[in-house]
UniProtKB/Swiss-Prot annotation:
Protein name, per record: ATP synthase subunit alpha
GO molecular function per UniProt: ADP binding; ATP binding; proton-transporting ATP synthase activity, rotational mechanism
PANTHER family: ATP SYNTHASE SUBUNIT ALPHA, MITOCHONDRIAL (PTHR48082:SF2)
Classification of source organism: Bacteria, Bacillati, Cyanobacteriota, Cyanophyceae, Synechococcales
Alphabetized PROSITE patterns for the sequence: ATPASE_ALPHA_BETA
One GO location term (cellular component): plasma membrane-derived thylakoid membrane
Primary gene name: atpA
Cited InterPro entries: ATP_synth_asu-like_sf, ATP_synth_asu_C, ATP_synth_asu_C_sf, ATP_synth_F1_a_nt-bd_dom, ATP_synth_F1_asu, ATPase_a/bsu_AS, ATPase_F1/V1/A1_a/bsu_N, ATPase_F1/V1/A1_a/bsu_N_sf
E.C. numbers: 7.1.2.2
Organism: Prochlorococcus marinus (strain MIT 9515)
Binding-site residues, ATP: 170-177
Length: 505
């Protein structure tokens, strides 16, 4: 029989008393009452907060949205095949956050910040809450720097500034995404961090966008956030906020950022689906009453920060899809009222061969004018008015047989201006090229060039400047102004290119 040693027992007891941990861990646990359609009703989560992350038994995460007397309504961020009635749910005490930082550049992530591009984990320790308060009035300053899109018709007539929210709106297949991608490509070498958020899109479309960005060397400074059409509604709803959080990290470091939300119509539809399944009362077009707040709190996060805050900026280009050009529907009118202007793309113009198919008459930039460079502002002042008048005259002239000479001349110039503004996809132009092209049209220097040869003339003019007048391009890009000496040089170049071209026609 083993002898009991009192000193050994007492030392063990003393050790256990010393190591005794008095802290009590309390976890708030509930039970799933009902589950289906990406929604779970949970009993027992008494201490949960609105918007809090929940963890289900199988590891699936959810967000508590409806806090009712006897149950909690939560949306699931995943398929949750292992969750069933009676499963346990634990509240985490946290709000959804995503990894941020330099390591995110060049990566494709889901709305939870998890990589989906097959390149392994993202080596970053920085995190940021998906939902953040927008900067207040004192932290902002007015928009004053240009955000060059590389698309002549936008930079000349509907200029966008850093920190602006400019809506791109139009029917399906009118080139909305093309404008956004061109803008990202044009930021190469500008030290701008871009975030492209794809909401409810086909996986093939997103893969195509990523491939184009990679080919053009734009993926190095771009983060792609994708919530595909097959993803849960909760993830499609969260995706834009994730994109904003990733861009905010760079904005508060004093950098310029550009975020594209493609598109917010799908996000609103995902939010409507969630709200109806949570039995929230429907409003106009069955959208919930707070769908305006859903978009306004997102787009208000775009700002140009004051110098005290580092001077960073977040420019937002939200995209909205209309049905048969109806901009008076609920979501389009909401987003138009939140943003600082809109670029309206017309299906009729697109089908007639005008690319980008921008309807100049109803497109507007409410704050971008202050940010426009002096060079383009000087020559493009009358361009928008001339094109808008041309559209009206062209419609009127179909019914009139004899037009006076001034009207005839205005129509002829309008045709040439429209041809000049045609631009191929994925080929953004720099400021000097835009100035040269617009100057030629506005000053009437190409009135003798046949309409069908105007596009060819514009290409030859740009080529001539690159080969023979590199110093002209350099000075415009550096000074961003068009002085008398440069105007004289440009006029001579245009006349020379025109005469050599007309000689061969």
């Amino acid at each position: 029989m083993v002898s009991i040693r009192p000193d050994e027992i007492s030392s063990i007891l003393k050790q256990q008393i010393t190591d005794y941990d008095q802290s009590v861990s309390v976890s708030n646990v509930g039970t799933v009452l009902q589950i289906g359609d990406g929604i779970a009703r949970i009993y027992g989560l008494d201490q949960v907060m609105a918007g809090e992350l929940l963890e289900f038994e199988d590891g699936t995460e959810g967000i508590a949205l409806n806090l009712e007397d006897d149950n909690v309504g939560a949306v699931l961020m995943g398929e949750a095949l292992g969750v069933q009635e009676g499963s346990n749910v634990k509240s985490t005490g946290k709000i959804a956050s995503v990894p941020v930082g330099e390591a995110m550049k060049g990566r494709v992530v889901n709305p939870l910040g998890q990589p989906i591009d097959g390149k392994g984990e993202i080596p970053t320790s920085d995190n940021r809450l998906i939902e953040e308060m927008a900067p207040g009035i004192i932290k902002r300053r007015s928009v004053h720097e240009p955000m060059q899109t590389g698309i002549t018709s936008i930079d000349a007539m509907i200029p966008v500034g850093r920190g602006q929210r400019e809506l791109i709106i139009g029917d399906r297949q009118t080139g909305k995404t093309a404008i956004a991608i061109d803008t990202i490509i044009n930021q190469k070498g500008q030290d701008v961090v871009c975030v492209y958020v794809a909401i409810g899109q086909k996986s093939a479309s997103v893969a195509n966008v990523v491939e184009v960005l990679r080919e053009k060397g734009a993926l190095d400074y771009t983060v792609v956030v994708s919530a595909g059409a097959s993803e849960a509604a909760a993830l499609q709803y969260l995706a834009p906020y994730t994109g904003a959080a990733i861009a905010e990290h760079f904005m508060y470091q004093g950098k310029a950022t550009l975020v594209i939300y493609d598109d917010l119509t799908k996000q609103a539809q995902a939010y409507r689906q969630m709200s109806l399944l949570l039995r929230r009362p429907p409003g106009r077009e069955a959208y919930p009453g707070d769908v305006f707040y859903c978009h306004s709190r997102l787009l208000e996060r775009a700002a140009k920060l004051s110098d005290d805050m580092g001077g960073g900026s977040m420019t937002a280009l939200p995209i909205i899809e209309t049905q048969a050009g109806d901009v008076s529907a609920y979501i389009p009118t909401n987003v138009i009222s939140i943003t600082d202007g809109q670029i309206f793309l017309s299906a009729d113009l697109f089908n007639s061969g005008l690319r980008p198919a921008i309807n100049v008459g109803i497109s507007v930039s409410r704050v971008g004018g202050a940010a426009q460079t002096k060079a383009i502002k000087k020559i493009a002042g009358t361009l928008k008015l001339e094109l808008a008048q041309f559209d009206e005259l062209a419609a009127f002239s179909q019914f009139a047989s004899d037009l006076d000479e001034a009207t005839q001349q205005q129509l002829e110039r309008g045709k040439r201006l429209r041809e000049l503004l045609k631009q191929a996809q994925f080929s953004p132009l720099n400021l000097a090229e835009q100035v040269a092209v617009v100057y030629a049209g506005v000053k009437g220097l190409i009135d003798e060039v046949p309409v069908e040869d105007v596009t060819k003339f514009a290409a030859e003019l740009r080529e001539y400047l690159k080969l023979n007048k590199a110093e002209f391009i350099e000075e415009i890009l550096k000074e961003k102004k068009l002085n008398e000496g440069l105007e004289t040089t440009l006029t001579e170049v245009i006349k020379e290119v025109k005469s050599s071209m007309l000689a061969t026609v």
